[in-house]
């Protein structure tokens, strides 16, 4: 097996250099961050002029693909036209910021929660998400957008592989859209990763295609199968458990993807310890 590309979701406080130092401290070879506040305001810590230099540093240090996380506030499936227009405009701006990193030779994706239909129905919600992405891609196609697998709470779209496939099929520029596989969300949505790992992967391949999966959010689950709760647990301390993560990091397809921890930092060393734990599960 090759070395895992793995890290956590990091703070951007202090800018690009501080972001990379945090990754070094936890022993990471991949990481995620918000390009602006999770609530939508532009982050002043990240200077677009320095993005290319940052990308070149990552490339030189052999980092795996970055998996930047779009703010939670974006809702491409919403009924509020002003908020939806903001999400489209802001996502395009985020992609433009990240394009300089990719052009420096460093692979980078932007991950989004597909959206919540807020009572309009799943069909309408999925159509709105596809239309929103089409508008984004009319402005910029510099970075691939990854749709995150969702746990299915509330009116979330993307609660199963078929809904994600519907959204992707509605996007004109299909080469510019992929998927982030969130381990907690997939279990919570009703896919039995613990007892039927191979079966779940077959369903994913049939609905979307494994080649479209570009990143993994590595989280254990507090509540487990079909709970639709979306509550992350630390690695090995939830309903997925160490046997599942052993299977994941030894899967010849999935283990090649950047793995991002979104688990709670119980101590300053939590993510370093989890990175070491997961690397230790790889069979030599």
Curated annotation (Swiss-Prot):
Keyword terms of this UniProt record: DNA damage, DNA repair, Endonuclease, Hydrolase, Metal-binding, Nuclease, Zinc
Residues binding Zn(2+) 1: 69, 113, 148
Molecular-function GO terms, alphabetical: deoxyribonuclease IV (phage-T4-induced) activity; DNA binding; DNA-(apurinic or apyrimidinic site) endonuclease activity; phosphoric diester hydrolase activity; zinc ion binding
Domain of life the protein comes from: Bacteria
Name of a matching Pfam family: AP_endonuc_2
Record-listed Zn(2+) 2 binding positions: 148, 182, 217, 262
CDD domains assigned to the protein according to its UniProt record, in alphabetical order: AP2Ec
Chemical reaction(s) catalysed: Endonucleolytic cleavage to 5'-phosphooligonucleotide end-products
InterPro entries: AP_endonuc_2, AP_endonuc_F2_Zn_BS, Xyl_isomerase-like_sf, Xyl_isomerase-like_TIM-brl
GO biological process: base-excision repair
Cofactor(s) demanded: Zn(2+)
EC number: 3.1.21.2
The record's free-text note on cofactor binding: Binds 3 Zn(2+) ions.
Residues the record lists as binding Zn(2+) 3: 185, 230, 232
Family assignment from sequence similarity: Belongs to the AP endonuclease 2 family.
Function: Endonuclease IV plays a role in DNA repair. It cleaves phosphodiester bonds at apurinic or apyrimidinic (AP) sites, generating a 3'-hydroxyl group and a 5'-terminal sugar phosphate.
Name of the protein described by the UniProt record: Probable endonuclease 4
Primary gene name: nfo
């Amino acid at each position: 097996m090759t070395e895992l590309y793995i890290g956590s979701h990091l703070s951007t406080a202090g800018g690009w250099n501080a972001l990379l130092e945090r990754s070094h401290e936890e022993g990471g070879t991949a990481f995620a961050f918000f390009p602006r506040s999770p609530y939508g305001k532009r982050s002043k810590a990240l200077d677009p002029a320095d993005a290319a230099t940052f990308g070149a540093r990552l490339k030189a240090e052999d980092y795996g693909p970055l998996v930047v996380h779009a703010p939670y506030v974006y809702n491409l499936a919403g009924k509020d036209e002003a908020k939806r227009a903001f999400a489209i405009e802001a996502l395009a701006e985020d992609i433009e910021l990240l394009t300089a990193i990719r052009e420096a030779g460093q692979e980078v994706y932007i991950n989004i929660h597909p959206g919540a239909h807020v009572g309009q129905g799943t069909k309408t919600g999925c159509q709105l998400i596809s239309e929103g992405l089409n508008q984004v891609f009319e402005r910029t196609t510099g970075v691939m957008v990854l749709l995150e697998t969702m746990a299915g709470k509330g009116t979330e779209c993307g609660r199963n592989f078929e809904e994600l496939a519907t959204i992707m099929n509605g996007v004109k520029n299909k080469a510019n859209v992929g998927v982030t596989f969130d381990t907690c969300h997939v279990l919570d949505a009703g896919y039995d990763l613990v007892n039927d790992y191979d079966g779940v992967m077959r369903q994913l391949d049939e609905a979307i295609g494994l080649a479209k999966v570009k990143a993994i959010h590595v989280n254990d689950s507090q509540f487990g199968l079909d709970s639709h709760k979306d509550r992350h647990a630390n690695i090995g301390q939830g309903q997925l458990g160490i046997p599942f993560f052993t299977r994941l990091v030894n899967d010849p397809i999935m283990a090649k993807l950047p793995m991002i921890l979104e688990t709670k930092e119980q101590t300053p060393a939590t993510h370093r310890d989890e990175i070491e734990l997961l690397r230790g599960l790889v069979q030599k």
